[in-house]
């Protein structure tokens, strides 16, 4: 995954929820909120982000609600967010 390339996707498609914690999304940079997700591993996080995920605090629509994103773009955005949240 290319975290640097993922920043643009994050800014365009992910920040709306992950910058503010909207709908229960873990805020980028909040190590405690991200820790349980990071513990599952990148492959699980990316798969959940691509297909959608219902967690205990909310739900994430498939591809963050942007079906135009490629799986690679989603993976890169996840890598960017994880890198900012470790």
Curated annotation (Swiss-Prot):
- Please report a single Pfam family linked to this protein: Cytochrome_CBB3
Q: Which domain of life is it from?
A: Bacteria
* Keywords assigned by UniProt, alphabetized: Electron transport, Heme, Iron, Metal-binding, Photosynthesis, Transport
PROSITE patterns of this UniProt entry? CYTC
Q: Which GO terms describe its molecular function?
A: electron transfer activity; heme binding; iron ion binding
Q: How is it modified after translation?
A: Binds 1 heme c group covalently per subunit.
Q: Show the SUPFAM superfamilies listed in the entry.
A: Cytochrome c
Does the record bear Lipoprotein in its keywords? no
What are the GO BP annotations of this UniProt entry?
photosynthesis
Q: For this UniProt entry, which residues form the secretion signal?
A: none
Locate the residues binding heme c.
14, 17-18, 60
Q: What does this protein do?
A: This basic c-type monoheme cytochrome has been found exclusively in the green photosynthetic bacteria, although its role in bacterial photosynthesis is not established. It has an unusually low redox potential compared with mitochondrial cytochrome c. It is reactive with cytochrome c oxidases but not with reductases.
Give the protein name, as stated in the record: Cytochrome c-555
Q: Which organism was this protein described from?
A: Chlorobaculum thiosulfatiphilum
């Amino acid at each position: 995954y290319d975290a640097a390339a993922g920043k643009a996707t994050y800014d365009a498609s992910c920040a709306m929820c992950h910058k503010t914690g909207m709908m229960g999304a873990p805020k980028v940079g909040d190590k405690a909120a991200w820790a349980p997700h990071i513990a599952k591993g990148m492959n699980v996080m990316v798969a959940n982000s691509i297909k959608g995920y219902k967690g205990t605090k909310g739900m994430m629509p498939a591809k963050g609600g942007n079906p135009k994103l490629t799986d690679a773009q989603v993976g890169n955005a996840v890598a960017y967010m994880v890198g900012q949240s470790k």
